[in-house]
Curated annotation (Swiss-Prot):
Coiled coil: none annotated. It comes from the Eukaryota. This is Ornithine carbamoyltransferase, mitochondrial. L-ornithine binds at residues 216, 282, 286-287. It is an enzyme of class 2 (transferase). Its EC number is 2.1.3.3. Pathway: Amino-acid biosynthesis; L-arginine biosynthesis; L-arginine from L-ornithine and carbamoyl phosphate: step 1/3. It is found in: Mitochondrion matrix. Carbamoyl phosphate binds at residues 97-100, 148, 175, 178, 324-325, 351. Residues 1-38 form a transit peptide. One of its GO terms (molecular function) is amino acid binding. It comes from Aspergillus niger.
């Protein structure tokens, strides 16, 4: 009878499954040149409109409108047909949402993919494991991560370590998908058909008046406007102005632009709306600011957008109104919100087309925006 086969002693299970090379690669304290974050094959992410050239931003807006027209007419563009077939997109939302979730999940489905929603009860960034570990593991199993988080540092860390594209669906500093939808809405309403260079969307010289809190939606809107040659006047109560570091980012967004949009700030709503084509506001109390609600409501008294404010301040005769939603009555009067000047509901719908355009550019086309 032959003797039993003898095998060489095996290393401990932990060492076998975690060899030195992998320990170096996935260490949370040391990242060599071989890590996904610094690899020459690292994906391109959309964290802010500041990440885009003027031409790229205008292209995303134009593609959103083009896909909207085609799909609504019953013709799915060839570039989108089954573009995400067999692919999973992780929807990592640590903040609740209505429009963002419906629009991004709907966009993935329209393109043939599978959206996997991971809410705050499913995954808590940086709580049970490091953001590094989460980014590496999740990105190894999906085609893209769409992240709606609290802090910009969280989505930036996800992108730094993800091997797949990360699209920022909102953080405390930026909201790029909203900016694409906003400029799609403005372009569809104001731009002369077939006129204007690609970089400008035909909107050069337009003026936006923002009346309310200086927040993430405003920041990406102002960055976009600077790139597109659109002027922005911001009216906030004292103490609620755009932070200095964000002003520097907005200023830098105009570099290389022939006629960048101008940004001015005031504490007087009437001064901001003078000569404005579009009046915009947003919530005065964002998620996470609930304890400040009473003080904020007092501080923002007099900043409600009304027809009387527009008339008193001298907005242009054909002015229009926008709001990213959800809306509260203290921010804008019913007469404006539900009136003929409101672009609010087309703006909300355009979130779907903006998401489709972004997924096409950053996931399907690997960051090549064309």
């Amino acid at each position: 009878m032959p003797s039993p086969l003898r095998t060489a002693p095996q290393p401990p299970l932990r060492a076998f499954h975690n060899p030195p090379a992998l320990r170096r690669l996935y260490s949370s304290t040391s990242h060599s040149a071989a890590t996904p974050a610094t690899s020459p094959f690292a994906p391109r992410h959309l964290l802010s409109i500041a990440d885009l050239t003027p031409t790229e931003f205008a292209t995303l807006v134009r593609n959103a409108s083009s896909h909207k027209r085609a799909i609504k007419s019953g013709s799915i563009p060839q570039s989108l047909h089954g573009a995400l077939s067999g692919k999973t997109v992780a929807m990592m939302f640590s903040k609740r949402s209505t429009r963002t979730r419906i629009s991004t999940e709907g966009a993935v489905v329209q393109m043939g993919g599978h959206p996997m929603f991971l809410g705050k009860d499913d995954i808590q960034l940086g709580v049970n494991e490091s953001l590094y570990d989460t980014a590496v593991v999740v990105s190894s199993m999906v085609e893209c991560i769409v992240a709606r988080v609290g802090k910009h540092a969280d989505v930036a860390d996800l992108a730094k370590h993800s091997t797949k594209p990360v699209i920022n669906a909102l953080c405390d500093s930026y909201h790029p998908l909203q900016a694409i939808a906003d400029f799609q809405t403005i372009s569809e309403h104001f731009a002369a058909s077939g006129k204007g260079k690609l970089e400008g969307l035909g909107l050069n010289g337009l003026k936006i008046a923002w009346v309310g809190d200086a927040n993430n939606v405003l920041f990406d809107m102002a960055i976009s406007a600077r790139k597109m040659g659109v002027d922005v006047a911001v009216a906030t109560p004292k103490g609620y102005e755009i932070p200095k570091e964000m002003l520097e980012i907005i200023e830098k967004a105009g570099e290389g632009v022939k006629s960048p949009g101008k940004l001015v700030q005031t504490n007087v709503p009437e001064e901001a709306v003078k000569g404005a084509d579009v009046l915009v506001t947003d919530t005065w109390v964002s998620m996470g600011q609930e304890e400040e609600a009473a003080k904020r409501l007092r501080d923002f008294a007099g900043f409600q957008i009304t027809s009387e404010l527009a008339k008193r301040g001298g907005a242009k005769e054909g002015w229009r109104f926008m709001h990213c939603l959800p809306r509260h009555p203290e921010e804008v009067a019913d007469e404006v919100f539900y009136g003929h000047r409101s672009l609010v509901f087309p703006e909300a719908e355009n979130r779907l087309w903006a998401a489709i355009s972004a997924l096409e550019g950053f996931v399907v086309n690997k960051g090549k925006i064309e």
